[in-house]
Regions:
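Short helix-coil transition/hinge motifs at the ends and kinks of transmembrane helices
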Residues: 37-42, 76-78, 174-176
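Short, well-ordered beta-strand elements within core beta-sheets of diverse protein domains
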Residues: 92-99, 173-176
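A hydrophobic, helix-centered structural microdomain
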Residues: 1-69, 181-203
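Hydrophobic structural segments characteristic of membrane proteins
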Residues: 52, 105-203
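Soluble non-cytosolic domains of exported or imported proteins
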Residues: 86, 98-102
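Residue-level signal for cytosolic alpha-helical hairpin/rod architecture
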Residues: 12, 89-92
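Short, glycine-rich, amphipathic interfacial segments at transmembrane boundaries or analogous
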Residues: 44-87, 147-169
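Juxtamembrane loop-helix boundary motifs flanking transmembrane segments in multi-pass membrane proteins
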Residues: 1-4, 84-88
């Protein structure tokens, strides 16, 4: 479930944003380098990848590393629960998480076609399998997104994420072509509002 028009907009927009944000990306790399130079426990790779599912296929989700490397090793491929504790974050990682900047490398995932700008957030294989055992399998049919309906509604409990995602899937089923793009753009504008308030987005 990935309309051609949606893919075209994703590719053009992701490429454009990468070019426009190249100074910011350079600044992040510089800040990360200074952090690892000054704070010994923050040392480690700039990027890390997690196994996630999009349209039933496994791919490597890219992120700027925000966790200390020793914590990341304990995370075993699912860092989100550890990111809630500020003590686990690097100095640079605290700023990246607040403004959602750790997700910027996923623009490359969008260019590659692993993800879209809008869709259910990609989950690790284990969580997708658990969701399928509960009788919910929409993640095997819909392309994952950088943001989605659940992420732009702050305060929604995690138990409601699936319901919000299913609302989005229903919209995809009832819309065609550019109508899907228009709906995505509305969610993207709402995402910018959340980011402007520095609230971060749920995974």
């Amino acid at each position: 479930m990935y309309p051609r028009q949606k893919r075209i907009v994703d590719l053009v927009l992701a490429t454009t944003v990468l070019v426009l944000l190249s100074p910011l990306l350079l600044l992040i790399v510089t800040a990360f380098g200074l952090d690892t130079l000054v704070v010994r426990r923050d040392r480690g790779p700039l990027l890390y990848a997690e196994r996630r599912i999009s349209r039933g296929r496994e791919f490597s989700l890219l992120k700027f590393r925000t966790l200390r490397e020793d914590v990341l090793m304990r995370a075993a491929g699912h860092a989100r629960p550890y990111e809630r504790d500020v003590a686990n974050l690097t100095v640079a990682g605290r700023l990246l998480k607040r403004w959602y900047l750790d997700e910027l490398p996923q623009l490359f995932n969008i260019v590659r076609g692993d993800m879209s700008f809008v869709g259910p957030r990609p989950w690790p294989p284990g969580l997708v399998e658990q969701q399928m055992r509960d009788g919910v399998d929409y993640r095997n049919h819909v392309v994952a997104g950088l943001t989605g309906a659940a992420q732009v509604t702050k305060g929604v409990p995690e138990a409601r994420y699936a319901a919000s995602d299913l609302d989005y899937v229903r919209e995809l089923n009832t819309r065609r072509g550019w109508s899907v793009v228009a709906y995505d753009l509305r969610l993207m504008v709402r995402t910018l509002g959340v980011l402007a308030r520095g609230q971060g987005l749920a995974d």
